[in-house]
Regions:
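Asp-box/BNR beta-propeller blade signature and adjacent active/binding-site loops
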Residues: 1-254
């Protein structure tokens, strides 16, 4: 569970976190200050279990309240080479609407410091309709395999938003060739959490134990707030990377 107190005075891993990096700051239409940062838990490096905190102040910075805009928590609130990472948040204010964009790295991936899991060029990660491409996890290759093995997998499936989408049941996985929904009786919500009816699957599509995994690259992950940073919407994935690019990264700041 996420700690009740976020910003403490000491870098002490016994309190569940130690470090924050990559700040961003904007002023909302009502004058509120909105700040975002990586929660880097017990490391300073990139990847391997990072999340996103957003703080807001309505009194010109005298006091602050925070929320966790992006959080998966796979493998606990700590460094783990098999974990996902939300990294490098960037903020954009458009009146009272605030947009938060960051890079989402699937389980184990990083750009500069991952010998086994470097992000790969060779695919945008999406089909021609902008749907997230997926490969079936097997004993041979899955969401925790090396990025080389993942890149060589067959991406025969895609994630498609349902016609009758709700927050609890938003997406379905379809076969690229037949457009049929895959077996497994899965429910996938608007944050890409996936569960099976029999309880055997209860994870997120970007975590290492997903039944269907993505091409090993980063994904542009965007949420928005329409109440000056108090709450945040379900995410949208944006297809912006070229096949020849290893990654397409957000430049954080103000």
């Amino acid at each position: 569970p996420f700690p009740k107190t976020l910003f403490l005075e000491e870098h002490n891993s016994s309190k569940g976190f130690t470090r924050f990096r990559i700040p961003a700051l904007v002023t909302a239409g009502n004058g509120a200050l909105i700040a975002a940062t990586d929660i880097r838990w017990d490391i300073c490096g990139d990847g391997a279990g990072l999340d996103t905190a957003v703080s807001r102040s309505t009194d010109n910075g005298a006091t602050w309240s925070y929320t966790v805009a992006n959080y998966l928590g796979d493998n606990g609130n700590r460094f783990n080479r098999d974990s996902t990472a939300f990294i490098d948040p960037a903020l954009l204010a458009d009146g009272d609407t605030i947009y938060l964009a960051c890079d989402l790295l699937p389980a184990g991936l990083a750009v500069a410091n991952a010998a086994r899991y470097p992000a790969k060029a060779g695919s945008t990660g999406y089909d021609t309709n902008g749907n997230l491409l997926l490969a079936l996890s097997t004993t041979s290759v899955n969401g925790l395999s090396s990025s080389t093995a993942r890149a060589a997998a067959s991406y025969d499936y895609h994630l498609e938003k349902k016609a009758d989408a709700t927050s609890e049941s938003c997406y379905e996985i379809k076969n690229n060739s037949t457009s049929e929904v895959v077996d497994g009786d899965y429910t996938i919500d608007d944050h890409f959490n996936i569960k099976s009816a029999d309880g055997a699957v209860d994870t997120n599509l970007f975590c290492g134990d997903t039944p269907y995994f993505q091409f090993p690259t980063d994904f542009l992950y965007i949420t928005k707030s329409t109440d000056n940073g108090a709450t945040w919407s379900a995410p949208q994935l944006v297809d912006a990377k070229n096949e020849s690019e290893q990654v397409f990264l957000i430049g954080p700041g103000r």
